[in-house]
Each structure stands twice: as C-alpha cells, then as structure tokens.
From Swiss-Prot:
Residues 246-466 form the Histidine kinase domain. Member of the two-component regulatory system MprB/MprA which contributes to maintaining a balance among several systems involved in stress resistance and is required for establishment and maintenance of persistent infection in the host. In response to environmental signals MprB acts both as a membrane-associated protein kinase that undergoes autophosphorylation and subsequently transfers the phosphate to MprA, and a protein phosphatase that dephosphorylates phospho-MprA. It comes from Mycobacterium ulcerans (strain Agy99). InterPro entries: 2C_sensor_his_kinase, HAMP_dom, HATPase_C_sf, His_kinase_dom, HisK_dim/P_dom, HisK_dim/P_sf, Sig_transdc_His_kin-like_C. It is found in: Cell membrane. This is Signal transduction histidine-protein kinase/phosphatase MprB.
C-alpha cells in the first residue's frame, strides 16, 4: 500500500496594495479625467459642427445672392469673375456646356461625381467636403448649375488650436483634481490616522485613553465607537484585575489554614513525633475537609462569574418551576431542619439554564444559611403581568441592615456578621450577574417590616411567558419600591428608612 502525505502549505504572501489615500486620489483623478475627456469631446463636436454649419450657411447665402441678382443670366462671365475678389471659388455650367470659373490663388474647385450628378440634373443640391474644401452644388431652374467652394484651412487651424487648448485645460484640471483629492483625502483620513495611532498605542503601551472626537460625520461616529470599545476594554481589564486580586485574597486564607492543618497532621505522623489526641485528629480532618469544600465552592463561584462576564452561555427555554424544584431539593439535603413554604406557578424564561439554576440555588442557600434551626423559608414564584414573573425567597433571619444592602451584591463583600459564617461572598454577586444578563431586576425587602427579627426577602424579577399549559392571573402589586444605586454609600437612597433596595439591568448597564 502506498501512502501519500500532504506537504506543508506554503505561507500566504501578503499582497501589496495601494494605501487608501492613494486609492482615493487615483479615483478622484480618474473621475475628473473621465469628465474632462467627455466634456472635451462634447465641446469639440459642438464647435466643429457650428463652424461647418456656418461655412454651409455662407456658401448658401453667396449662391442665393448670385441667383437673386440676375447677373448669372445677364452676364454670367462677369458675375463669376466677381467672386474672385472674395474667399470662395465659383463655377457656372450652362446647358450648352459653356463653363465659367473663378478660383482663389492656389486653389481649384473640385468636381466629382456628386457635382456631375447636379450638372446632369440628377440631383438638385449637393454638399460635401473634399480636398480641404467645402463644396456646394445647386441645379438652377434654367438648366444651369452653380458650384461654389470655400477652403477649410482656416477652420481646421481653429480646430487644431481648440484641441490644444482642450488638452492643456484637461491636463491642468486632472492635475488640480489630483492635488485637491490628495489634500481632501489627507484631511478626511486624519481621524483614521488618529484611530490607527491609538490602536498602535494600545497594543504597544496598554494606554486606553479615549480619542478626541471632532465633528459629527461618519468618521466621528467611528471614533466614538472606537472610544466605546476602549472604555469596554478598560472596564474588562479593571474587572479582571479586581477579580484576580480579590480571588487571590480570598484564596489565601483557606489555603493558609489548609496548609497549616496538613503540615500539623503530617508532623504528627512522622516517626518519633508525639501523637495528637484522637479528638484533635478528628477535628483537624474535619477542618481539612471543610476547607477543601470551601475552596471548591470558591473556585466554582469564580468560574461562574468568569463564565458570565465572558458571555459564554447557551440560551434556551427554561422552566422556572423545574429550576426551583431542583434547587430546593439540593438545599433540603443540606438543611433538613428548615421548613420550606413553596408556591410556584409555571413560567418559562428564554435564557441560560445553568445560570438561572445557580441564581435560584444561591438565593435559597442564602435564606437557609441565615434561618435559625426550625425556621421557615418562603419560596414564591408568581406572575405579575403577561411578560414578567417574580421569584421571592424570604427568611426570618436577622435581616440585612440598610447600609449593607447596597453592598451585598458586590463581589467578595461580606458583612461583619457574615464573616463568621461559611461562604465566599460571591453568591449574591452571581445572582445579580445572572439577573442582569437576562434583562431582569433584583429587590431586597424586609420579610416582616419592623419585626424582630425583620428577616430578608430577595425578589428576582424575570421576563418571560407562562408555560403553554398555564394561565395564572397577575398578582396584585401591593408593594411599591424605588430603584436606587447599589454601588456603595455614594449612591444613598433618597428615603431615610432604606427598607427597600432594587437593581435592574438598565440602571446597572448605564453605569
């Protein structure tokens, strides 16, 4: 068996091409040259036709003058000789074949087949150009024939000068068009040059400063779009740097603790080392397992955040009732001492199934974590209008203070009271990211306003539609909320109580 192997492909050669400036300038020159050529031909044709028509009119007028004067009949020889003092050649042929001629010096009136046809009476009139002369032949009523011609050399001299003038003017026009096209192209492509320099600067120095925008034309819009790209790139780098910094900080603590415990276990197992009490060994092993679980959770949260930032998601129809059921089953396995009150309607969201499941699970985990043993967690999915439904997860825990409500959706934020609890500070940040990516909004309320404890209710509004086999009336809108900024203390709520905080996709994206 003979085998063939394809050799390596030759690298593609970069084809050299003219710059945009040269292409625009050559295009302008070509267009101007085309217009100049067309106009030159038109001018030449019009002037040439006018000059030849004027010669024909002169010959016709001279013939009519001779005929009308009657001199051709009274004294034809004298009448023809009189034309010698003008700029025409003349010939009179009588029926008896007597011929009278008068020519200009150095010229002879040409007689060809058309003129002979007029003399024989076959044609009444003939006009033609021959031997640098314009010849007119007319058959008269008395049987005579009058032939008159005029030299075209003066006319041809004028046409020669006209051709030279048109050629010079056309050449100057093309040259001016080239210079003007180059100047206009240079001025018009100056913003493109600035964009090129900015792109090279970004690639060379990571400088993401915006480019000044001049005017309001298409190039100005291109500059604005490039500035938007620079801002998005700067924000992406800032998020990446912040994520790496925060992740490193959050990973350092469990890794240090895990390393300490592992080293202690390894040291106790070396020959001759004192043995740790069994109770301490069990505690160390439990700590190691707990720290590994904490690291796994933290890494999973970081992966989810990175996945959401990159937009690598697959959108599909998602049944939120199934999402709630699956998430609730997982939470119940971890907290079987909590009572869950569930009221769910059929609702379909077109989005990321994994992201929506993670958001619902994080809300339920958060509510279960802060609920005391034997506490109750409410889970309610209700339809608000034909295109929106709301998932409300509430608990009867200690609640969230108004000052901290503005920070709980930020990455790695953990309140003072939450630092003693397990968690990475990424759960609600993931919820916020998922909700905003689906065009929804979040709202935090007290479960029991003014209660002790007040509890926490997190409301997740999602666009979608009822399931095909569901028809649920819209729930009454019994609570009014005021959207406020969730970025920190600088965006304080206008209401002093700050009992409610909300964030939606539009306000978040506007930032």
């Amino acid at each position: 068996m003979v085998g063939f192997r394809r050799g390596p492909r030759a690298p593609l050669r970069a084809t050299s091409s003219l710059s945009l400036r040269w292409r625009v300038m050559l295009l302008a020159m070509s267009m101007v040259a085309m217009v100049v050529v067309l106009m030159s031909f038109a001018v030449y044709a019009v002037i040439s036709a006018a000059l030849y028509s004027d010669i024909d009119n002169q010959l016709q007028s001279r013939a009519q003058l001779l005929i009308a004067s009657g001199s051709l009949a009274a004294d034809p020889g004298k009448a023809i000789e009189g034309t010698a003092y003008s700029d025409v050649n003349a010939m009179l042929v009588n029926p008896g074949r007597s011929i009278y001629t008068a020519n200009q010096p150095g010229q002879t009136l040409p007689v060809g087949a058309p003129e002979k046809a007029v003399i024989h009476g076959d044609l009444f009139l003939s006009r033609r150009t021959v031997s640098d002369q314009r010849v007119l032949a007319i058959h008269l009523p008395n049987g005579s024939s009058l032939l008159i011609s005029k030299s075209l050399k003066p006319t041809e001299a004028v046409m020669t000068k006209l051709r030279a003038v048109l050629l010079i003017v056309g050449g100057v026009g093309v040259a001016v068009a080239a210079v003007a096209g180059g100047m206009v192209t240079r001025a018009g492509l100056r913003p493109v040059g600035r964009l090129t320099e900015a792109a090279e600067r970004v690639a060379r120095t990571d400088d993401l400063r915006p480019i000044p925008v001049f005017g309001s034309d298409e190039l100005a819009r291109l500059t604005e779009a490039f500035n938007l790209m620079l801002r998005a790139l700067a924000e992406s780098r800032e998020r990446q740097a912040r994520l790496v910094s925060d992740a490193g900080h959050e990973l350092r603590t469990p890794l240090t603790s895990l390393r300490t415990n592992v080293e202690l276990l390894m040291a106790s197992m070396e020959p001759g080392a004192p043995r740790l009490p069994e109770q301490e060994m069990v505690g160390l092993r439990e700590d190691v397992v707990a720290q590994i679980e904490e690291l796994s959770t933290l890494v999973g949260d970081l992966v989810d955040l990175t996945r959401g930032d990159a937009g690598v998601v697959v959108h599909e129809p998602v049944d939120m009732a199934e999402v709630v059921d699956r998430s609730l089953e997982r939470v119940r396995r971890r907290r079987n001492d909590i009572h869950f009150d569930v009221d769910v309607v059929g609702w379909q969201v077109y989005g990321d199934a994994a992201g929506l499941s993670r958001a619902a699970l994080n809300l339920m985990d958060n509510a279960a974590k802060w609920s005391p043993p034997g506490g109750r967690v409410g889970i309610r999915l209700r339809q608000l209008d034909p295109s929106h439904a709301e998932l409300v997860v509430s608990d009867n825990g200690p609640g969230i203070s108004p000052q901290e409500r503005r920070l709980v959706f930020e990455r790695f934020y953990r309140s003072t009271s939450a630092r003693a609890m397990p968690g990475s500070g990424l759960g609600l940040a993931i919820v916020k990211q998922v909700v905003l990516n689906h065009g929804g909004s979040l709202r935090i309320e007290d479960t029991v306003p003014g209660g002790q404890p007040p509890g926490t209710a997190i409301c997740m509004l999602l666009p979608g539609r009822p399931m095909p086999d569901s028809a649920y009336p819209a729930a009454p809108d019994d609570k009014k909320t005021e959207p406020v900024d969730t970025r920190g203390a600088n965006g304080a709520n206008s209401r002093g109580s700050a009992n409610v905080i909300s964030v939606d996709s539009q306000s978040a994206r506007a930032r």
